[in-house]
Amino acid sequence: MFVEFFLDGSAECTAYYYAPSATKISTFPTVWQPASILANDTTAQAKWQSIMGSIPTTILPKGTSTGNFTNVTYSASDPDCWWSYHQCTQPKLSGLSADISSVPEPGTLGFGFDDGPNCSHNAFYDYLTSQNQKATMFYIGSNVMDWPLEAQRAVADGHEICVHTWSHRYMTSFSSADAFAELYYSKPILMQAIKLVTGVTPKCWRPPFGDVDDRIRAIANALGLQTIIWKYDSNDWKAGTGNITTETVDANYQALINNMTSGTFSTQGTIMLTHELNNYTMSTAMKWYPQLKAAFQYLVPIAVALNNTQPYVETNYSFPTFDQCESFLCW
């Protein structure tokens, strides 16, 4: 199977035409704009109609899609298990599983990166390949539409792919139908831009900024998506804003390592939020990788840390068990 990658750094972020995605662009929402169910998309409309009865109507949208919650009135009892309010990860609505914010295997880091695929990620992915390191990549649907070949590379390299919504907005701000669209159109674009070559359909997602409540969880659950959060935040995505400096980010990486060496993860592992957002976040990940590798017993994709050997809908693609990784037989 031939998969084309851009190796020339000067060409990596030059827009290109890729027929399988370009010819279907009219069947998706406008890239980087909040998604809604398209008026002519009878398949999406039928899917929404089939699940809307399971979505709570008593949980209302909160704030704006850019994260302004100033005018939100919300009970201190946190009735909706709203992560942005108090980092709740145990749903209060029956029938929903807890968010994944840690992993059961001791001494283990569920290794992953948000906001890809980044058009300039070849050096980063080359580095991961050189270390025989796989990770979980949380991909934005609009990015996949913009950079389909880069998305292909992740699957070809053996990384796990999860959904990170269509437009990367605060999910609890949307109506239920629009929140459905943010996830629904992300799953198909991952299929259509990647499945043509690799045939994978994700079964996991991460809400941008962690913004999720039981209404959004119910929508994700109805689409077969498991919610993955994190326990530690590198704040690499905030570097250079407010009081967050590159020194802050380095200190956050070091704190994670210190917690590992002090025994914090002796009974269960953890997940740290890091990003494929830009050259800084990827370079920082490479800078700290040797120290993470030395400190943690295992750095593995989140699916492997959860012993999930079938990370996709398709059953012809499988991951190793954690025990296989423990025996250095991962890949």
Where are these regions (language model features)?
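Terminal accessory/targeting
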Residues: 1-110, 131, 135, 267-331
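Acidic-and-aromatic substrate-binding clefts and catalytic sites of carbohydrate-active enzymes
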Residues: 116-120, 139-148, 169-177, 205-214, ...
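Short coil/turn segments at secondary-structure boundaries
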Residues: 123-126, 232-233, 286
